[in-house]
């Protein structure tokens, strides 16, 4: 015999009809100001402390990297579209700044 669904739906409808949030909204506001914002500030401060300039690694001309079978259609044909001369080496090595 099938159970009637009416008592189940009424229970859910009456629970949704009550106060909206109340203590739950206060709890999340408290968690935001006590946990989330200080955590973001701490992570920001940590990344600021570790943001020093690091020397770039020694260039090693691996055969499987930086393969140019035909030149790029922009610039001199050897630089990629978003080439950064500070971190991206060319097939012959790093560019001198």
Swiss-Prot record:
Its cellular-component GO annotations read: mitochondrial inner membrane; mitochondrion; respiratory chain complex IV
Keyword Oxidoreductase attributed? yes
Q: In which tissues is it expressed?
A: Expressed specifically in heart and muscle. Not detected in brain, colon, spleen, kidney, liver, lung and pancreas.
What changing residue 43 to R does, per the record, is: In MC4DN18; reduced complex IV assembly; decreased COX6A2 protein stability
Keywords carried by this UniProt record: Disease variant, Membrane, Mitochondrion, Mitochondrion inner membrane, Oxidoreductase, Primary mitochondrial disease, Transit peptide, Transmembrane, Transmembrane helix
Q: Where in the cell is it found?
A: Mitochondrion inner membrane
Q: Which GO terms describe its molecular function?
A: enzyme regulator activity; oxidoreductase activity
Q: Which ranges does the record list as Mitochondrial matrix topological domains?
A: 13-24
Mitochondrial intermembrane face of the membrane: 50-97
Q: Associated disorder, per UniProt?
A: Mitochondrial complex IV deficiency, nuclear type 18: An autosomal recessive, muscle-specific, mitochondrial disorder with onset in infancy. MC4DN18 is characterized by hypotonia, limb and facial muscle weakness, and high arched palate. Some patients have respiratory insufficiency at birth and cardiomyopathy. Patient skeletal muscle shows decreased levels and activity of mitochondrial respiratory complex IV.
- Entry similarity comment: Belongs to the cytochrome c oxidase subunit 6A family.
Quaternary structure and interacting proteins, as annotated: Component of the cytochrome c oxidase (complex IV, CIV), a multisubunit enzyme composed of 14 subunits. The complex is composed of a catalytic core of 3 subunits MT-CO1, MT-CO2 and MT-CO3, encoded in the mitochondrial DNA, and 11 supernumerary subunits COX4I1 (or COX4I2), COX5A, COX5B, COX6A1 (or COX6A2), COX6B1 (or COX6B2), COX6C, COX7A2 (or COX7A1), COX7B, COX7C, COX8A and NDUFA4, which are encoded in the nuclear genome.
Q: Know the name of this protein? A: Cytochrome c oxidase subunit 6A2, mitochondrial
Instruction: Name its species.
Output: Homo sapiens
Q: Which gene encodes it?
A: COX6A2
């Amino acid at each position: 015999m099938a159970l009637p669904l009416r008592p189940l739906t009424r229970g859910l409808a009456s629970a949704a009809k009550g106060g909206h949030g109340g203590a739950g909204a206060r709890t999340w506001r408290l968690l935001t100001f006590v946990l989330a914002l200080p955590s973001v500030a701490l992570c920001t401060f940590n990344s600021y402390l570790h943001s020093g300039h690091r020397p770039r690694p020694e260039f090693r001309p691996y055969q499987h990297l930086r393969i140019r079978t035909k030149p790029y259609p922009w610039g001199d044909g050897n630089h990629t579209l978003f080439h950064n001369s500070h971190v991206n080496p060319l097939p012959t090595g790093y560019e001198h700044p």
